[in-house]
UniProtKB/Swiss-Prot annotation:
Binding site for a fatty acid: 60, 92
Name of the protein: DegV domain-containing protein YitS
Binding site for hexadecanoate: 60, 92
GO molecular function: lipid binding
Domain DegV: 3-282
Function description: May bind long-chain fatty acids, such as palmitate, and may play a role in lipid transport or fatty acid metabolism.
Keyword terms: Lipid-binding
Amino acid sequence: MTVHLIADSATDLPRSYFEEKGIGFIPLRVSLGDKEFEDAVTIHADQIFEAMQNGETPKTSQASPQTIKNVFLQYAETGDPALYIAFSSGLSGTYQTAVMIANEVKEEFPDFDLRVIDSKCASLGYGLAVRHAADLCINGNTIQEIETSVKNFCSQLEHIFTVDDLTYLARGGRISKTSAFVGGLLNIKPLLQMEDGKLVPLEKIRGQKKLFKRIIELMKERGDDWSNQTVGISYAANKEKATDMKHLIEEAFKPKEIIMHPISSAIGSHAGPGTLAIFFLRK
C-alpha cells in the first residue's frame, strides 16, 4: 500500500522535489504591508530580502487551515495512508492546526490512516527529514515504520544558524536593537541552534573566519559517521559564502553528500539576507 507524504514550505526544498516525489505541499503565509502571499507559490525569498533591505518588515503566519484540509481530503479519497511531517511547533502554529484538522477529516473518513508529526525541525534540517521519509516510502516501508524512523531522525538532527546582520532579528523582536547595533559595530556573528524545536542563542563569534572555524569545530564535536551522512546547507542571498562553507565541510569530513538550497521566504522573513545554516545528524 502506498504511503503518501505531506510537508510544508519551511523545508526549504525546491518545489520540483515535491513534484518529483509526489509529496503534498502546504505553503506557509507571508505578509508584506497589507498584502498576503503563499510561500514559494506567490512570493519567493529574493522578493522578501529586497523588501527587508528597503526597510520593510515581513510577517509570517501558519498555513491556511483550508489549504491544510484540502490537501488532507485529497489523500483521504485515495484510501491510502498519509503522513504529514510538520514544521516545528516551536516556530509555527501549523502543527497544532493540522492535528485539529486531521481529527475533523478522520471523522468524515474513519478508515483513513492520517498521521501528523511535529518534526521540531526547520529549514533544510526539516527538509532532510522529509527526504529521509521519501526514501523510506520508495523502499516500501509501512506508515508505522516511516513514522517511527522519521521521529528518531528528527531527534538527532543538529541545526546551526548564523545571521550576517542582527538588524533583521531586532526588527522581528528576536533580539534588542541595542544588541544589534553593538553587534554590527564589532562585526559580531551570532551562532544559534535548535533546542526542543525552538531557535536559541549558542555563541557570539567575531569575524567570519573565526565563525566558519567554530562551525567546523562544532560539527567535529557533535557529528559522526560522515561517510553515511547527508549534510544540508541553507543560505539567504549569500551563495558564495555557503559554497565556501561547503568546501570546508568537504575537506574536513568528506560526507556522503552535501545539499545546498536557498532559504524560503517564510524562514528568511525572520533571519534576513546573509543567513547561513548547517544541518547534520549528531552522534
